[in-house]
Amino acid sequence: MQTPSLELKGSSFTLSVLHINSQDMAVIAAELDSKLAIAPQFFLGAPLVVNLSAIKASDFDLLGLKEILTSRQLIIVGITSALPVINDMAKSIGLAIVKSGKAATNQPQMPKTTKIVKQNVRSGQQIYAKNGDLIVIGAVGNGAEVIADGSIHVYGALRGKAMAGAAGDRNAVIVAQKIEAELVSIAGQYWLTEHLQQNEAAQSGCIRLEGDSLTVESLPL
């Protein structure tokens, strides 16, 4: 029997959501550039859904926002929580209208394996623990990336980027003896350096998700 040339199947994907709280395109562009300068590879080519729940004006420049994002190699696939007139505008420029989903009743499958790295992770290196947790017995240097579908434990200083719950596991955590990271992310929610610097507990801590926000708690040394 000949295989059909196409098949339509249901599936789900984890997308980052960009919340827009201003109508000033210059301000949006400047703030976006500052974030991209800190972690360019993390955002490069990232598909985004734009949340416009904070925008109450019908003359919002959606096309201008799209151009700002695409010119920086970010891919806007749709918008959510927007006014009806903005939804109509989105359809006219080829963007999807994404409905806010209900909280998932089933969490992603728990990690099955643990990857252990018994050395420092140096600048330019990327370590990925697929379908499992990642344990680094050593430091993660500036410019290095550690990624896991589960949790990340660093028995040393975390100075690079750490992305846990990469497959959507919201129960994942990031634990490190010293957190001086360029970026930390759990299931798509992220903090950059400035957020961590504001939190004194981050010297030795555990980062986790509470709702849609990251939190950090100090650990005994």
UniProtKB/Swiss-Prot annotation:
Q: Name one GO biological process term.
A: division septum assembly
| Keywords associated with the record | Cell cycle, Cell division, Septation
* Cell division recorded as keyword: yes
Stored Pfam families:
MinC_C, MinC_N
Spell out the InterPro entries in the cross-references.
CAP/MinC_C, MinC, MinC_C_sf, MinC_N, Septum_form_inhib_MinC_C
Superkingdom of origin organism: Bacteria
Record has Phosphoprotein as a keyword: no
Q: Which SUPFAM superfamilies does the UniProt record give?
A: Cell-division inhibitor MinC, C-terminal domain
Q: Say which family it is in.
A: Belongs to the MinC family.
Protein purpose: Cell division inhibitor that blocks the formation of polar Z ring septums. Rapidly oscillates between the poles of the cell to destabilize FtsZ filaments that have formed before they mature into polar Z rings. Prevents FtsZ polymerization.
**Quaternary structure, from the entry:** Interacts with MinD and FtsZ.
Provide the protein name: Probable septum site-determining protein MinC
Gene symbol of the encoding locus: minC
